């Protein structure tokens, strides 16, 4: 809830925040200048957060850097040399570090993994692999090295090779690791071929991952040829595959485990749908629509409390999806009520199928094609990029139906109680993003949404969920110079008191009684390949547009 602050003790802080806020959106002489961003984007090879999101690692053309980002921002380690670093990964906040060179210089190789002690600045060991190292992950017990067609598993305490997994070509080295000691898993894309009964039984894999899975479950996979969107779950403790999750029908682009290792988030190369599965059973718990137009998902990450999922994309936005009771009920409602043809159509928005299936879908669901395109111009080439359909016009909470509340995802899980005590339940709106393109698009989308709601009152319930897809709870726009900027994001679960300018939210500046407001926010940290660290604030009760709190150029000398 927003509160105004008039204490004289905060005057200096307010002045500092005002200056910082103004600089954040300046195009001249600030850390966001085009010249600086172009320069930094050319030297950043790799960006990553460590396992608990307390540190940032940056791979550079001339070495690497490590920064603390929680509780306070600051550089903790820097190594400079003439070798370009392609991968740099930490083991939590310990002195153990894994690095891989780009191989651009004479004598360096992208096939060599170095395990380094940052305290002594010494190399513990070197490991040479048969092909280029694409990804490296560290847990308390395992070292995982991903190549294009192999995954190597080591005991991190002895550096002994425990197991080697032969995989289908994995050009990006896509994988996900669960860091929980009780649920230590590895996820990687399944081979894009028909899986037979014999191969499943021989390797101990079943489609549901449960001990009571039936032969019908296996045949459901084996009867689906050339699947490329399946994910294999591998137990890092027993060194055995335990299940196959049918995540998408097109190629997997990104995935991430929850912090407790119980859930897996996935997105395909289409970039329109984000799904959350239960690892133990393979059951789909949540399904969110990020947008209608295709985009590249760079990363998925659960919040520290596993109640939110963050998705960064090539549209320079970060979407935050809430894993609440309403969203779970909405996904369950869709699963039960949507007819088979609609389910197929939902899958078809992500990938392509055979000509026969495509023709069948067009014949049976032609009338639904327009309403399935829900109007999220998330990747339209304008300055605003992704927006929420309802972010600028909100229906009073008491008039919302369950499906609509889940669709907008703007109320808290216990929204009824919160709304009864506070009139300010509408989502936050960033006045700085109110461009003409966004206003026009909002008008057309709101009209479409109202029409869908009216139609939903007259149509059977199985069609209403088609008209109202589950959307993100909040989003933010990255103020990047280049459209090719990549980003990763994390979110903590500690509410912090922040002062933000009243003009950030007030549409009428004259009506603002105070210059600043005190807001309770979750902090979201976003690192980009332009060498910037952004801190945004998320209102957990209202959602909507996240608030830019501060920024740091992490490549500047200190």
Swiss-Prot record:
Biased composition (Acidic residues): 367-392
Chief location of this protein within or outside the cell: membrane
Molecular function as annotated in GO: phosphatidylinositol-3,5-bisphosphate binding; phosphatidylinositol-3-phosphate binding; phosphatidylinositol-4-phosphate binding; protein-macromolecule adaptor activity; ubiquitin binding
Domain of life per record: Eukaryota
Transmembrane domains' residue ranges: none
Bias (Polar residues): 402-424
InterPro entries, per the entry: PROPPIN, WD40/YVTN_repeat-like_dom_sf, WD40_repeat_dom_sf, WD40_rpt
Topological type in the membrane: Peripheral membrane protein
This protein's UniProt keywords: Autophagy, Endosome, Membrane, Protein transport, Repeat, Transport, Vacuole, WD repeat
Cleaved signal peptide residues: none
A Pfam entry, by short name: PROPPIN
Keyword Transmembrane annotated: no
Compartments, record wording: Preautophagosomal structure membrane; Vacuole membrane; Endosome membrane
Domain notes from UniProt: The N-terminus might form a beta-propeller domain involved in specific binding to phosphatidylinositol 3,5-bisphosphate (PIP2), leading to the association of the protein to the membrane. The L/FRRG motif is essential for the cytoplasm to vacuole transport (Cvt) pathway, for the recruitment of ATG8 and ATG16 to the PAS in nutrient-rich medium, and for its recruitment to and dissociation from the PAS under starvation conditions.
Annotated family: Belongs to the WD repeat PROPPIN family.
Alphabetized PANTHER family for the sequence: WD-REPEAT PROTEIN INTERACTING WITH PHOSPHOINOSIDES WIPI -RELATED
Function: The PI(3,5)P2 regulatory complex regulates both the synthesis and turnover of phosphatidylinositol 3,5-bisphosphate (PtdIns(3,5)P2). Necessary for proper vacuole morphology. Plays an important role in osmotically-induced vacuole fragmentation. Required for cytoplasm to vacuole transport (Cvt) vesicle formation, pexophagy and starvation-induced autophagy. Involved in correct ATG9 trafficking to the pre-autophagosomal structure. Might also be involved in premeiotic DNA replication.
Protein name: Autophagy-related protein 18
